[in-house]
């Protein structure tokens, strides 16, 4: 759903910032 997609996007952004 939209919530799962949003969580995936946020997770990707946080992972990118963590590098």
UniProtKB/Swiss-Prot annotation:
GO CC annotations on file: extracellular region
Main location: secreted
Entry keyword set: Amphibian defense peptide, Antibiotic, Antimicrobial, Secreted
InterPro entries the UniProt entry points to: Aurein_antimicrobial_peptide
Compartment(s) where it occurs, according to its Swiss-Prot or TrEMBL record: Secreted
GO terms of biological process kind: defense response to bacterium
UniProt tissue specificity: Expressed by the skin dorsal glands.
Role this protein plays: Shows a medium antibacterial activity against L.mesenteriodes, M.luteus and S.uberis.
Name used for this protein in its record: Uperin-2.1
Species for this entry: Uperoleia inundata (Floodplain toadlet)
């Amino acid at each position: 759903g939209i919530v799962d997609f949003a969580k995936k996007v946020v997770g990707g952004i946080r992972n990118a910032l963590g590098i």
